């Protein structure tokens, strides 16, 4: 096993582990539950247990409202990228991948700006500190992502590479813009102490037009410096710059650049700017004097700005393969041994060395969540940069990081739905992970359960569908919602549970004399075949509907078939027989003699079954009401039998 690059971070938990007892724990998706057990450490004295349980979250970012927007919006970009990859397989997609990368960066920048606004509006110091920390992380993400976009996705060659790096520095180092704003707000800009810092700062970023505009203010306000300003302006104007259109070859550019540089050196040698130290400094920057450039580290603020400025004036046609040398030397020169590199410095150095695996590794160490590494790795995988890098347990790096990121989303009460799509696009282990996580989604509401159910049904996750339906059926049953419980048990195709709920419906009918949830029972359809008891419930309700519609003959036949089929619970037999009483008392004979004999047999079978299952002492205690009902039934059956025999005899004559 590889050794850890850094020691794991320690999280102190006040009050836990101070009573010399062993600590128990339970892992959750993104959470860790900690508690003190009954077991004491050896040699320790008996002490009271800590009465609290502690929930430790590994990723607090997921609960930030601003970062939730980042997760939501980047999800749609991710899904769009996967779909376009399927549609355009085999085609060159460089321009599209660059656009996708910019979309990700746009979302990052929007979140940063919103976080800035929150930081400025909040008055609570602790919350403000948290916002500043998150802004710092988001800024590092966008800075690193932008560099990876230039080096790995655009794969810019010598020449255009420097143009992109200049844009990168201008976007992320804005110190000079703040300086110039202060200068221009003053009454006399050219006399402002930071005026020449603004000119030099623009030059260091290759923004020659802006530098010339500031220089023009100096020329108009100082007659003595006007001629020098004109010479310096001419040098800035003449500085060769490669264009991204590629209309100029590198050889032509290098020739022009060499002539221009020689002209700058001549002016220095001739002492053109000797009377104005500020202009001389600018000219020394133009000829690539590294000592002078390094003296302006306060304007550049970062070593990577120094790197790009150094390349601009010394090696404008630097090749991608040479970047790592200049990057390392620029870092060493900028820090000058006064401080050690920060984690962000290591990430950028790894990028300049084109070691994308080290970039991912370094950012995984410093980041509090997997968003950056998961999405960047996925994007670079579409650039065919990870094909040869498989992890020891089978999954490639892209899938491993996406699985971890999606697992983290499942710990959130609403973001778990985003995690489903990430699992979908992990071909090796995604389906297995999704099955395990869907079983652990808390089904707090029926709406959430229906969402989870649709997800599982769409992906043919049969066991998870059954599990969700059973869970919701039990919740509904515990809450006394029999209709909902029956509906969920039918969806789960759980015959045993459907039988249990059907019995509850029948018990409720016996106690109240009517059914609840009639719409559900009336529309069971083929679902009633799930269990015998459910079939009985549906048919018994159909009998009541026929009776209410005065379809007495059909109702009588159905009632008799329900009794002879013996699918009703024993406790319900007397209720069925009593339901026959109104039909037996009709003026018109409903039950034939044969049907009446069947009813009599059912009554006697019921009595015999009751005698077999009841002790003699209990028989004596039987309620007289039941006895009265049975006597009424026997009398009604006898009368109906006599009427039926007479009627049938008359019909035969």
From Swiss-Prot:
Pfam families documented for this protein: Nucleopor_Nup85
Gene behind the chain: nup85
Top-level taxon in the UniProt lineage: Eukaryota
Keyword vocabulary terms for this entry: Membrane, mRNA transport, Nuclear pore complex, Nucleus, Protein transport, Translocation, Transport
Family: Belongs to the nucleoporin Nup85 family.
Functional note: Component of the nuclear pore complex (NPC) that seems to be required for NPC assembly and maintenance. Involved in nephrogenesis.
Subunit record text: Component of the nuclear pore complex (NPC).
Keyword Nucleus set for record: yes
Primary location: nucleus
UniProt key word Nucleus: yes
Name by which UniProt lists this protein: Nuclear pore complex protein Nup85
């Amino acid at each position: 096993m590889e050794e850890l690059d850094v020691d794991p971070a320690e999280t102190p938990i006040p009050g836990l582990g101070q009573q010399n007892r062993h600590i128990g724990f339970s892992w959750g998706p993104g959470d860790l539950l900690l508690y003190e057990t009954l077991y004491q450490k050896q040699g320790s004295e008996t002490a009271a247990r800590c009465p609290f349980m502690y929930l430790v979250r590994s990723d607090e970012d997921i609960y930030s409202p601003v970062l939730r927007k980042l997760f939501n919006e980047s999800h749609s970009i991710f899904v769009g990228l996967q779909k376009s990859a399927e549609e355009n397989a085999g085609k060159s997609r460089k321009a599209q991948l660059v656009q996708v990368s910019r979309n990700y960066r746009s979302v990052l920048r929007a979140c940063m700006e919103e976080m800035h606004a929150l930081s400025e509006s909040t008055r609570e110091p602790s919350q403000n500190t948290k916002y500043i920390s998150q802004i710092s992380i988001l800024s590092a993400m966008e800075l690193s992502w932008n560099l990876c976009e230039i080096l790995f996705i655009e794969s810019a060659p010598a020449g255009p590479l420097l143009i992109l790096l200049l844009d990168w520095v201008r976007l992320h180092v804005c110190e000079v813009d703040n300086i110039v704003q202060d200068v221009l707000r003053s009454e006399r800009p050219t006399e402002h102490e930071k005026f020449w810092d603004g000119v030099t700062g623009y030059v260091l970023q290759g923004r020659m037009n802006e530098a010339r505009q500031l220089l023009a203010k100096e020329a108009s306000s100082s007659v003595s410096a006007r001629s020098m300003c004109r010479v310096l302006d001419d040098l800035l104007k003449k500085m060769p710059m490669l264009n991204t259109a590629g209309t100029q070859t590198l050889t032509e550019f290098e020739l022009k650049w060499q002539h221009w540089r020689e002209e700058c050196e001549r002016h220095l040698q001739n002492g053109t700017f000797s009377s104005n130290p500020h202009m001389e400094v600018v000219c020394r920057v133009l000829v690539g004097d590294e000592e002078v450039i390094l003296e302006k580290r306060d304007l550049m603020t970062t070593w990577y700005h120094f790197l790009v400025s150094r390349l601009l004036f010394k090696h404008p046609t630097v090749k991608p393969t040479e970047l790592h040398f200049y990057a390392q030397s620029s870092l060493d020169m900028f820090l000058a041994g006064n401080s050690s590199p920060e984690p962000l410095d290591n990430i950028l150095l790894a990028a300049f060395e084109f070691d994308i695996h080290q970039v991912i590794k370094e950012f995984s160490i410093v980041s509090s969540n997997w968003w950056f590494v998961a999405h960047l790795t996925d994007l670079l995988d579409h650039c065919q940069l990870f094909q040869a890098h498989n992890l020891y347990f089978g999954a490639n790096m892209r899938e491993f990081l996406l699985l971890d990121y999606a697992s983290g989303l499942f710990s959130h009460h609403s973001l778990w739905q985003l995690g489903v799509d990430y699992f979908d696009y992990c071909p090796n282990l995604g389906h297995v992970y999704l099955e395990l996580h869907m079983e652990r989604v808390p089904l707090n509401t029926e709406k959430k359960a229906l969402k989870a159910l649709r997800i599982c049904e769409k992906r043919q996750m049969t066991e998870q569908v059954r599990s969700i339906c059973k869970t919701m059926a039990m919740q509904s049953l515990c809450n006394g919602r029999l209709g909902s419980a029956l509906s969920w048990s039918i969806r789960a195709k759980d015959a045993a549970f459907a039988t249990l709920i059907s019995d509850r419906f029948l018990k409720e009918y016996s106690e109240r004399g009517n059914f609840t949830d009639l719409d559900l029972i009336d529309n069971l359809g083929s679902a009633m075949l799930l269990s015998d008891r459910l079939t009985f419930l549906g048919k018994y309700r159909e009998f009541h509907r026929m009776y209410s519609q005065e379809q007495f003959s059909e109702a009588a036949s159905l009632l008799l078939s329900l009794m002879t089929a013996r699918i009703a619970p024993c406790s319900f037999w007397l209720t069925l027989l009593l339901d026959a009483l109104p039909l037996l008392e009709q003026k018109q004979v409903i039950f034939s003699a044969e049907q009446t004999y069947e009813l009599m047999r059912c009554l006697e079978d019921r009595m015999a079954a009751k005698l077999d299952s009841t002790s003699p002492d209990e028989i004596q205690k039987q309620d007289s009401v039941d006895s009265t009902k049975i006597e009424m039934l026997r009398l009604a059956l006898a009368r109906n039998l006599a009427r039926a025999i007479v009627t049938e005899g008359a019909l035969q004559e």
